[in-house]
Amino acid sequence: MPPRYPFGGGAQSDEAHHQPLERRTTAEAQGNSFTHGHTAYPTYDMGAEPHSPPHVSYDPYLPPSTSGDHSGYEMPSANYNDHHRSSYPQAIHSPPRMTNPYANSQPRQGSADPFDEHDGDVPLLPRGGNYAYAPASHFDEHGNHVGPVDKYADGDDDVMDEDAVNGQARGRLLHTQVPHDDDYMPGGFDPNVLENGQAGGVRFGKIPQRVPRRYKTLKRVELYHGNLVLDCPVPSKLLDKLNDRESREFTHMRYTAATCDPDEFKTERYTLRQVLFDPPRRTELFIVLTMYNEDEELFTRTMHGVMTNIAHLCTRERSKTWGKEGWKKVVVCIVSDGRLKINSRTLACLAAMGVYQEGVGKNVVNGKPVTAHIYEYTAQLSIDPSMHFKGREKGIMPVQILFCLKERNQKKINSHRWFFNAFGQILQPNICVLLDVGTMPRPRSIYHLWKAFDINSNVGGACGEIVALKGKFWGALLNPLVAAQNFEYKMSNILDKPLESVFGYITVLPGAFSAYRYIALQNDAHGQGPLCSYFKGETLHGGQSDADVFTSNMYLAEDRILCWELVSKRDSAWILHYVKSAQAVTDVPDQVPELISQRRRWLNGSFFAGIHSIIKFGYIYRSSHSFGRKFALHIEIIYQTIQLIFSWFGMANFFIAFFILTSAMSDKIHALKVPNLVLSYIYVAFIIFCFLLSMGNRPAGSKAGYTLAMVVFALLTVYMTGAAIYLAVDSILNATGPNGGGTDALVSNRTFVNIVISLAATFGIWLIASIMFLEPMHMVTSIVQYLLMAPTFVNVISIYAFANINDISWGTKGSDKVMTDLGVVGGSGNNQVEVAIPTESKDINDAYDDAIHVLSNKAPKAGPGPVDKEQKQKDYYATVRTNVVLCWSLSNAALVVGILNISSIGTRTIYMGFLLYSVAGLALFRMMGSTIYLIKRLFSGE
């Protein structure tokens, strides 16, 4: 009877490693002799005891000859050099003829035959029946393939394999023209229901298997310094695609089961591949990608962008640091927050690149629960967002990847602790780059970011420009939410960031795309410093602290705390810098609930962190900054204080402007007096409505209410703008009339001066600054949407933020339950453990097939997620929340009453002019800073 899992044959099959048996035997002998020569390191080729069961589960279809093959897992050698190389054949640059597993099946009734269009390419979606087909029908009793031969269609790109049976057929992963349905997902589950009962049709936590795997061998392995470390051969099907198959870093993936806290990683004698090379590799750039449950499109967008940047570093052959071998100085660390939370299709991408292998990880090692699964591999292939492989022929260079899959969901700040305190302590990098999955750095951005540190040794942190994703043909700008955020991002990168960079203190380096000098972040001998302050947020939001509401909200913006602690570090003179040339694209919230929830954390965190920097400004005197730098920081802190005051009274000032303008128009047109009064009542009513919504309703649960408030405020803004235009035009007509008095009367008209000159100055400054930075398009495509959204930012989002300062649930406690679904590694004495791992080439390749198969099928569109009925409003800090909201609302109300009811009309006009000129003055101040930045940039060589 043929084997049930015929991929690659058994241990006696030449397909096992695609090489002759005698060559493999020689290679194994050489490998064994090499490993036995290094007794200081563990040997993973120990073999099984004669009385040990050969497999965890007996399979009657498994050929007996495979039971004794345990050559797959060898030691993680300290020397990854030419003396120990895999004996895989040289790279095949033209792929072999392929087999077509569907050649004898019939197409579905009423559907087009995909083979007619693709000329023999294996289609992504079979013609019918179950995807979990029985591949044994294509093999004889000896395991030899007898199926039909498929054609290979050449294309411009090497594209990812759609491996229906043997993983050798090439074709696009996603054929949009091929008829298909979404009723099937690998693994045999309903695409509309997740494993946990949620809708969406995408698994989380593991790659779905088309056929249950039972080929696991019980092996006895030595612990490496008391830790479980395995060198796992990558699938031979992946090796067939690689240009370089000689070095062990390309032929083996290294797995480490970490059972410690990140801070104890080094003391527990864990290590990483880079320090095991002879000589050890120096890490110049250490890049971290933090992710949670992002899908494969977001992941590949970021990962492919990073690999493209590394390829650019390797093209800079005249550089003293970079060049052809520059990739050896870069390590990319991917930290996924929670093993059961990771998207299965993202995991499949990692498996397709060779970074991840299903079935290797374990839950418990010698009674210690595993806290993180660490996979190390040097990938030669990149996957772009269209699901195509890109290799050396497209300029992609090898990339050292460190994939840390955390066992529990402990939030982003814990992921950064693994990055800085665990892996950073081992690698001791020069520059650390922080990226969020979903943010795509442009091809040379990382180089420009690194260059800022190389040019100026005082730079301790830097950030690039975050660009809103506009979509194809800028179609995303049709959404007013996206357009408004696009304008906001652009003006911040043109006016705010350059100004702060000139002073040397940028209030926030966005965690989505920023970089730090590693030594600048280190704590002092007493354990105090930037990283210590930064990681306080993990315990505050992990339920392990009784911190007050001020501190808790302050650490919602822990990246702002890190920036301040870095600039004010004791006996240091680090500065923060903005790099205009470094750009990264990210998608912004395009739905009302997402926008409000995101801005709630931003506003609360930035507000309380701003207060923190003002109160703790004295820390600047403990630093080693020069007198000139300290003087500049004094000016900046005054500017930040003014900004904070305007932010606090923003709600009142917007209503005052609305009331004064509409009242002035009522004086000109008496018929509008009653309608304007009604509009003022509507304005106040919706302010109250927003308070009621914010106190008891989540944005996702009250989307219609929040959207209604945003629309009403936008309409009121349109009316207010019309009133301002009418008053300006009326003033001009009166001044130029027969009895108007001409220009002198126009200049003496306070209403005209306040409205026209101040607003013209503001918009003029925006336009001039945008032209100076050679980016004026947002002034055309997005300014109207931004002006209409302005009252939403001032009223709706601010009210929600202040009304929910008690919500500090940005970080949550992870579950303390120890999972055992991956398996438990038990000790057998003498520093050895017994571990069940896939060793057969067929089983390793089958797991690789599953990953390719998952990516080969179009992901079903996720429907709206169900509302969590268990969610309830938290009452933590409720009293403080009430007091803050009362203070904020009453102070704004007092300002409104004082200006509109108590003062005279002349006072109103003066205050209106003060508001408008303040906006213009702050814009002018920012423009001066950005101009200085551009001048410095011309001479700095950035």
UniProtKB/Swiss-Prot annotation:
Key words, A-Z: Cell membrane, Cell wall biogenesis/degradation, Cytoplasmic vesicle, Glycoprotein, Glycosyltransferase, Membrane, Transferase, Transmembrane, Transmembrane helix
Basic and acidic residues: compositionally biased ranges: 14-26
Gene Ontology BP terms: cell wall organization; chitin biosynthetic process; septum digestion after cytokinesis
TM region positions: 641-661, 674-694, 709-729, 755-775, 783-803, 885-905, 909-929
GO molecular function: chitin synthase activity
Region (Disordered): 1-124
Top-level taxon of the source organism: Eukaryota
Locations listed in the record: Cell membrane; Cytoplasmic vesicle membrane
UniProt-listed Pfam families: Chitin_synth_1 (PF01644), Chitin_synth_1N (PF08407)
Glycosylation sites noted in the Swiss-Prot or TrEMBL record: N604
Residue stretches of biased makeup (Polar residues): 27-36
Cellular component annotations (GO), alphabetically ordered: cell periphery; cell septum; chitosome; cytoplasmic vesicle membrane; plasma membrane
Record carries keyword Transmembrane helix: yes
Descriptive protein name: Chitin synthase 4
Gene of this entry: CHS4
